[in-house]
């Protein structure tokens, strides 16, 4: 289940602006 959830978040992360830092992604999806 965790893998599926991670992949779903990864797909969403691709739609974020390129200038969104990995740190911000961790806050959003961590």
From Swiss-Prot:
Species lineage: Eukaryota, Viridiplantae, Streptophyta, Embryophyta, Tracheophyta
Organism: Digitalis lanata
Record's protein name: Acyl-CoA-binding protein 1
Subcellular location: Cytoplasm
Domain ACB: start-end pairs: 2-30
A cellular component term, taken from the record's GO annotations: cytoplasm
Function according to Swiss-Prot or TrEMBL: Binds medium- and long-chain acyl-CoA esters with very high affinity and may function as an intracellular carrier of acyl-CoA esters.
InterPro entries cross-referenced by the UniProt entry: Acyl-CoA-binding_protein
Disordered as annotated region, ranges: 1-30
Domain of life: Eukaryota
Keywords annotated in UniProt: Cytoplasm, Lipid-binding, Transport
Membership in a protein family: Belongs to the ACBP family.
PROSITE patterns assigned to the protein according to its UniProt record, in alphabetical order: ACB_2
Residue spans of biased composition, Basic and acidic residues class: 1-15
GO terms of molecular function: fatty-acyl-CoA binding
């Amino acid at each position: 289940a965790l893998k599926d959830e991670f992949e779903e978040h990864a797909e969403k992360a691709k739609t974020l602006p390129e200038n969104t830092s990995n740190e911000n992604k961790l806050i959003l999806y961590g």
